[in-house]
Amino acid sequence: MRQVMNAIPDDLLITAPDEVRIRQDLVLTALGHRPADRSLRVGRLLDVHSRTWSEDQEIVIKGRRIAWVGPAGSYPGEVRERVHRPDVAAVPGFGEVHKHIESSHLTPEWEAALVLPHGNTWTCEASHEFSNVNGARNLEFWFEARRRGSPLKIFPQPGSAVPPTAYEWGGGWYGRDEQARFMAESLMVTGLDEVMDWPAVWNPDNPSYKRLWGMIEATFAARGVVEGHASGLRDLPSINAFAAAGLASDHEVQTPEETWDKLTRGLFVELRVYAMDEIVRWLLAKGLQDWSQIAFTTDDRSASHTLELGASDHNARLAIEAGLAPEIAIQCLTINPARHMRLTPFVGSLAPGRFGDVVLLSDVGKLTIAEVWADGVQISEGERYIGQVPEIVWPDWATKTVNIKRSIKPQDFELRAEPGRATMKAAVIRPFHWHPEFYTLELPVRDGAVQRDESEAITKFAIVDRFSGDGRIAKMFWRGCGPRTPETAVACSVAHDKHNIWVVGSSDAAMAKAVNALIELQGGWALVREGELVATVRFEVGGLMSCRSAQALDAEMQALYAEGRKVDWMYEPTYRPRWYPGFPERLMFATLTCAPWSWVLVAPCEQAPLGFINVQTGEAHPVIW
């Protein structure tokens, strides 16, 4: 039978019309009526659908897709190139079910170069970081590297937390109409990013209630997935209510019992490393047989930590060390997340029609990666990336996002006392202050301003608006963080999830100097020690990421850490287990406003002019009185 050879569409981005033509060609290639580009013959192959191994198998590839899988030598058609790897086991490319690429602090093309050698060939991008900086350009940003040829497939989920609460402003705003457009625009949009504002889900009086349910409705209408975030929700009424809302998953589980209660109410559980060993051992002892509702996630892993630990392959190794069968761990990286995100036609298994994403293991039990293939070609050898990194000059809409049209001055951080007062009462919170009430302390007044109290580990913390152009500042006193070293401050433009600038310091002058350095950098880190700017790290894309290799970024971060070790940092334990002594890097996450936070500091805006607000109730309060 004579077949007309038509040009096959480029399937870097998935569209329905192109998908039809690609699959028409794959049908004929599988039947042997059209030639295949290459075959990859392996010692054995894991079918993740049945969790079974087959010996001496061949994966036949056409374009970027798998056309045929079966016993070596039995493919009926012509193959232009043959590759034989007899000593390795083939498993599907690993998928990140829930990841904020922004937290690697690398742009997508450099993220690809970092994670692909770890087997991570596709990522569901939980996009409420960049979308809170430039919501209008969100999909364009996430598709650009792929459009330019990057092998990493990114499936964006527009953020439900844009803004995170009704009391924050700037950078982006998403509601029902925006989500409906996103879902209609691309088959690669899988749904709605983690719903974090739990009070806005259950309380009809919450000012975000209508916006959030509108986004959920738009996602349901397109048969998308609504991802959840159930931090702190451990009682059965709350878990049942969360599941009843249609929120499909949780990646915040901390205990085995919480994990079980959520699994048995139908939630898809995405395990991070923090409690993985305990949870996996407990579930095995419990006798869990069906692990299909479980996947592994790195969530907010930085480039430095990925260089040190690995990507989701590290999570899987921890699970295997805890006693999980390697084949089940691989399912938790492949078919489980693909099914959950409804992406099985494209990724998640070594089967016809899927992208040619293959991880070749030299040791299955240790999950030792020999090679990674993506889009049907080899892109890594051991830990070395050998694929393409597109050269992208990111435009101003991505690189000019710190919009502060003035110089910040020390007096901007003063908290002026009432005339004649020797002391003032102050509202005080701590990093990760999950308590429903703030502390009240009496603080001294000097030169008309309320002062820090080092003896009580009280310092000053501020949020600087970077979107309006005015550089509006909310400031208050925090406990148990920040520098004791005089004239010292650290500032950062990564402030989850609205990503204004946060700064903490032992003097107002040092705080101003650090923030002004970030304005000039267009985002990143700035450390001022004893009045001198001693270290900066550049996050020039969105104030969140940098367009360079992980190794180059890590070198700059290590220099920051080295200078940070010369500072005497205050520290007190808090509610969150991952709050550590020393350089306060995790203050990036102490600005979160989702559940279980109550009292928080946000940049001043119309919805929260004082900046200090209870996001559970909407109550505002002065920071001094």
Swiss-Prot record:
Cofactor needs: Mn(2+)
EC number(s) recorded for this UniProt protein: 3.5.4.2
Pfam families: Adenine_deam_C (PF13382), Amidohydro_1 (PF01979)
Top-level lineage group: Bacteria
Keyword annotations from UniProtKB, A to Z: Hydrolase, Manganese
Keyword set includes Hydrolase: yes
Any one GO molecular function term: adenine deaminase activity
Catalytic activity entry: adenine + H2O + H(+) = hypoxanthine + NH4(+)
An annotated GO BP: adenine catabolic process
Cysteine-cysteine disulfides: none
Enzyme class: hydrolase
Residue ranges of coiled coil: none
Similarity annotation: Belongs to the metallo-dependent hydrolases superfamily. Adenine deaminase family.
Protein name listed in UniProt: Adenine deaminase 2
Source organism (scientific name): Bradyrhizobium diazoefficiens (strain JCM 10833 / BCRC 13528 / IAM 13628 / NBRC 14792 / USDA 110)
Source organism phylogeny: Bacteria, Pseudomonadati, Pseudomonadota, Alphaproteobacteria, Hyphomicrobiales
Name of the encoding gene: ade2
